[in-house]
Regions:
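Extracellular/periplasmic catalytic domains that process cell-envelope and extracellular macromolecules
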Residues: 45-50, 102-104, 144-145, 168-170, ...
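Catalytic core and acceptor-binding pocket of nucleotide-sugar-dependent glycosyltransferases
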Residues: 7, 198-316
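Active-site-proximal specificity loops/subdomain of glycosyltransferases
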Residues: 67, 91-147
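Short active-site oxyanion
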Residues: 84-90, 150
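Acidic, Ser/Thr-rich intrinsically disordered and amphipathic helical segments
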Residues: 38, 53, 67-71, 75, ...
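GT-A fold catalytic core of metal-dependent nucleotide-sugar glycosyltransferases
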Residues: 111, 132-192, 196-203
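Juxtamembrane luminal stem/stalk of type II transmembrane Golgi/ER carbohydrate-processing enzymes
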Residues: 1-68, 73-74, 81-85, 104-108, ...
């Protein structure tokens, strides 16, 4: 199902050089077809030559100035080879204030309509609003695959420090980061984290995402990540032939199992951490450590591993 956009106290026109837009306070919910056309237009502008986009979701709580979203964008600007990736980033706003904030600072913004649900506040882990938000995300990503787009999905509390594309497995259909990685990329006992994944659009991944989304009915009290941990062993995945690969925490890292070597790390996720203020504090520590690392002479970087002292407030 493709979702339309809702226009309630939101700017109507797409992002331009001048962020001041025409404002229309009149409620109007476009049809599903109109929403699909708008989304397709955004995807076409953002996609790479092989129809790949980078996607993140954003709500009001994380969109506020000096909050998670600003740190997320900053990481692209100071990362190694990541600035040019911003032109491929599509920010999917879950409420009007997040949408307005996105339009003020970024190019590709899309407002995802969720009738009867308010996603603007901080969604605490495993709360009913959190579960609805996670499954809404899976359904939306499924629609991108159906439209023929490959994507990297990234949570906004992930700092992009290096271009991840060269680190993906060429044979993987569905590649996912981990809370805990046990050493082998095809080992189903790795503990994945749904906050970062690279998915190629093909019949296998479309079938898989449909199966994943439908499995929420079988496991009504679990979020998408826990449901994935159930279905990754299901014979259906072998039947459709999907190749699942788990990404090493040495490169695609997080606070659960932080990489100790800044010479290798691509991304750093504020996982295993609850509380917005804790995340913000520790992600600022990450960016400051990265700035110091980046200013270190290359010969010194190569001569010994350079690490960082994280997590701090997010410590388990």
């Amino acid at each position: 199902m493709l979702f339309g956009v809702i226009v309630v106290t939101c700017f109507l026109l797409s992002r331009s050089a001048n962020p001041v837009k025409f404002f229309n306070p009149t409620f109007r919910q476009p049809s599903e077809g109109e929403g699909k056309v708008k989304l397709e237009r955004i995807l076409e502008r953002a996609a790479t030559a092989d129809k790949t986009v980078i996607v993140t979701t954003l709500n009001e709580a994380w969109a506020a100035p000096n909050s998670i979203f600003d740190l997320f964008l900053e990481s692209f600007h100071i990362g190694n080879g990541t600035t040019t990736l911003l032109k491929h980033l599509v920010v999917v706003a879950l409420d009007c204030k997040a949408y307005d904030r996105c339009l003020a600072v970024h190019t590709h913004c899309y407002l995802l309509n969720t009738p009867g649900t308010n996603f603007s506040g901080e969604a605490f882990f495993m709360s009913p609003i959190y579960l609805r938000m996670m499954w809404r995300r899976i359904d939306f990503l499924k629609s991108l695959l159906e439209m023929g787009y490959n994507f990297i999905f990234t949570d906004t509390d992930i700092m992009w420090l290096r271009d991840p594309f060269p680190r993906f497995y060429p044979d993987g259909d569905f590649q996912i980061a981990c809370d805990f990685f046990w050493g082998k990329p095809a080992d189903l006992f790795n503990q994945p984290n749904g906050g970062f994944n690279f998915v190629k659009s093909n019949n296998r991944t479309v079938q898989f995402y449909k199966f994943w989304y439908e499995s929420r009915i079988k496991y009504p009290k679990l979020h998408d990540q826990d449901v994935f941990n159930k279905i990754k062993f299901d014979p259906f995945l072998r039947e459709i032939g999907i190749k699942v690969r788990f990404l090493s925490t040495a490169q695609f890292s997080g606070f659960c199992q932080p990489s100790k070597n800044l010479n290798r790390v691509c991304t750093m996720h504020a996982n295993c951490c609850t509380g917005l203020h804790k995340k913000i504090h520790d992600l600022k520590v990450v960016l400051e450590a990265w700035r110091k690392f980046s200013s270190t002479p290359p010969k010194l970087r190569a001569s010994r591993p350079i690490s960082w002292k994280i997590p701090q407030k997010c410590r388990l």
